[in-house]
């Protein structure tokens, strides 16, 4: 099911304060490096309504370039030709990555959501770094009601008891842990969009299994002492203790819950849905995370253990931490949409 969500869009041009002329502040933390990426980023800033056509044109160019290279392949490849082919393939991959990233950024722009900038030290007396706006409602609306219900459970898992405390309470956390939490939440958003699309399609086609609401969670509740943003714990779907069985009904009055649907799926299907499909997507998750939190300063000691003593600790509120998680989940959902759209125009996913 290919998302058709890249048509039109409102203009959200962000000019750096105190500057004049055509200098525009970055609308995303990752810098575009390829000529195609820089062109698309400029179009997104100044003429966002032209971006869909520009993306399609660039994907056509990539396909033509790939076809031309295939036709030019000699019967006996020498080392020089192989090297040239490898360089061209890397250039295509970088271009493809930045096309996907630009489509992700466009989704944030269309929903009037400002992406969180690089997390850096501030002059605030408390050391707070989370002075970005509260956009929880906007980030909620990019998901279906059923999906956001599961996102709230994800927040409860990764934040734990912090969810019940004042949102203005300041906590200290290392950048490495923040990066792990952010990257894991991207992967959760990717999985959630993928499985939600299947759920919504089956519900529309009235092909949902009759007994799927009777299934139980296959996973044990997470160990309270475990770091809950470990990717291994992300696809746990524990039932709520106060679950009243209410779901989202159809025209016939039948009640369905995405949570119950996920628990109904077999482990092989769950694993497949939780797997990132392309190396380009994996690379973008890494780049987005490092653009926000920097490259982790980790050293391997002689005994094989990891030394993270140089890891920087930052302060932020529970509200800011919540915004980080919600943005990451939205990023993952948009990543699935963008990857699927690009695949519909330029086949690059492995079967």
What kind of region is each of these model predictions?
Residues 1-26:
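N-terminal chloroplast transit peptides
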Residues 17-351:
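Long compositionally biased, domain-poor regions of proteins
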């Amino acid at each position: 099911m290919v998302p058709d969500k890249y048509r039109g869009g409102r203009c959200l041009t962000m000019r750096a304060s105190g500057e004049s002329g055509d200098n525009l502040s970055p609308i995303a933390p990752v810098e575009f490096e390829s000529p195609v990426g820089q062109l698309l980023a400029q179009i997104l800033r100044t003429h966002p309504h032209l971006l869909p056509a520009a993306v399609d044109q660039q994907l056509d160019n990539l396909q033509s370039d790939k076809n031309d290279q295939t036709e030019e392949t000699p019967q006996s490849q020498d080392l020089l030709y192989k090297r040239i082919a490898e360089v061209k393939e890397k250039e295509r991959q970088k271009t493809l990555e930045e096309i996907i990233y630009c489509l992700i950024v466009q989704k944030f722009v269309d929903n009037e959501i400002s992406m969180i900038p690089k997390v850096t030290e501030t002059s605030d007396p408390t050391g707070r770094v989370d002075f970005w706006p509260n956009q929880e409602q906007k980030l909620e609306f990019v998901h279906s009601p059923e999906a956001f219900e599961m996102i709230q459970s994800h927040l409860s898992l990764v934040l734990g008891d912090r969810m019940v405390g004042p949102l203005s309470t300041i906590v200290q956390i290392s950048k490495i842990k923040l990066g792990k939490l952010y990257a894991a939440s991207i992967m959760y958003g990717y999985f959630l969009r993928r499985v939600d699309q299947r759920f919504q399609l089956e519900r529309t086609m009235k092909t949902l299994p009759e007994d799927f609401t009777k299934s139980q969670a296959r996973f044990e509740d997470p160990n309270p002492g475990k770091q809950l943003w470990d990717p291994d714990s992300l696809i746990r779907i524990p039932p709520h203790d106060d679950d009243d069985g209410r779901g989202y009904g159809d025209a016939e009055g039948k009640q369905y819950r995405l949570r119950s649907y996920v628990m109904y799926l077999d482990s092989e299907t769950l694993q497949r849905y939780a797997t990132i499909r392309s190396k380009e997507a994996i690379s973008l998750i890494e780049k987005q995370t490092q653009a926000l939190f920097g490259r982790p300063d980790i050293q391997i000691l002689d005994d094989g253990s990891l030394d993270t003593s140089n890891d920087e600790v930052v302060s932020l509120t529970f509200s800011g931490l919540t915004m980080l998680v919600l943005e990451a989940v939205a990023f993952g959902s948009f990543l699935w949409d963008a990857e699927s759209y690009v695949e519909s125009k330029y086949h690059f996913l492995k079967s």
